[in-house]
Amino acid sequence: MSLRGKNVTVHDMTLRDGMHPKRHLMTLDQMVSIATGLDEAGIPLIEVTHGDGLGGSSVNYGFPAHTDEEYLGTVIPKMKNAKISALLLPGIGTVDHLKMARDLGVHTIRVATHCTEADVSEQHITMARKLDMDTVGFLMMSHMNGAEGLVKQAKLMEGYGANCIYVTDSAGHLLPEGVKERLGAVRKALKPETELGFHGHHNLAMGVANSIAAIEVGANRIDAAAAGLGAGAGNTPMEVLIAVCSLMGIETGVDVAKITDVAEDLVVPMMDFPIRIDRDALTLGYAGVYGSFLLFAKRASAKYGVPARDILVELGRRGMVGGQEDMIEDTAITMARERGLKV
């Protein structure tokens, strides 16, 4: 089908999902440099927070170089056209965090839950709407729920007041057919005025293909990150997505050359290691494991002598989901003991 002339809002993840491979240690100067570059390139919406959202600073998830208030308060005044969003996971972020973000000028709040637990988002979505924010319901790990189940969860979030619903491939596990099945069903079930979004990861190199598949069935918000900087093998690479959209006639309002320069000149030099599909990132996608588990598994591997790939496969077998990072070390210890390794 032709998508020529279709308008899509691209939402940048470099400064939020990209915090995972940076161990949440981006400097304020790095944040401002990349955000202003994205703004200049025409990116309309940029997410800025700890990798695990507002309030994510903790022993479990990692301590950032600066507070959410410092990151947001530094970046927002520098924006000429782009709006700033923030992620919030109920149980990590609170209503007070939400109000703080709004007072600092955050435009969009994305309330994220596991794809079967939308009911825990009611308080935060309701409050965000009362504060007149662009309010997004964000269903994570969507490969773990079928189309019918996702429809029920999406309708809950819409009922709480969300004006946009995201179906999120947190593990980079879905293929285009699975994306179309899930997002197509959700699109048909939502009110016409409720927007639909897709967030992809590149663990099986499907980020761009899945994003186009999502657009084909009605998604009009698409997440991506410059140079793919994000958890696992990264998010959908923004510069590649923009180039493909341009070739297909999909309107994003983003300059291909400028976003490519942001990726090449600003983001790649900042990487602590190459964001690529190595064997462990591939295992994330293949086994359907939450993307931010990757570095935790690698650290546990170095500590206990169990290959990270084996740990990730076991986490997938156990059905571990985002928020259970503390179980990764426990799993590695159990596996090491079973293999007769010294713990």
Curated annotation (Swiss-Prot):
EC number: 4.1.3.39
Keyword Manganese attached: yes
Active site: H20
GO BP annotations listed: catabolic process; L-leucine biosynthetic process
Organism from which the protein derives: Dechloromonas aromatica (strain RCB)
PANTHER family in alphabetical order: 2-ISOPROPYLMALATE SYNTHASE 1, CHLOROPLASTIC-RELATED, HOMOCITRATE SYNTHASE-RELATED
Taxon lineage: Bacteria, Pseudomonadati, Pseudomonadota, Betaproteobacteria, Rhodocyclales
Single GO MF descriptor: 2-isopropylmalate synthase activity
Binding annotation for Mn(2+): D17, H199, H201
Residues the record lists as binding substrate: R16, D17, S170, H199, Y290
Domain of life: Bacteria
Catalytic activity: (S)-4-hydroxy-2-oxopentanoate = acetaldehyde + pyruvate
Alphabetized UniProt keyword annotations: Aromatic hydrocarbons catabolism, Lyase, Manganese, Metal-binding
Domain Pyruvate carboxyltransferase span(s) in chain numbering: 8-260
Protein name: 4-hydroxy-2-oxovalerate aldolase 1
Gene3D superfamilies: 1.10.8.60, Aldolase class I
Enzyme class: lyase
Site, Transition state stabilizer: residue positions: R16
Family: Belongs to the 4-hydroxy-2-oxovalerate aldolase family.
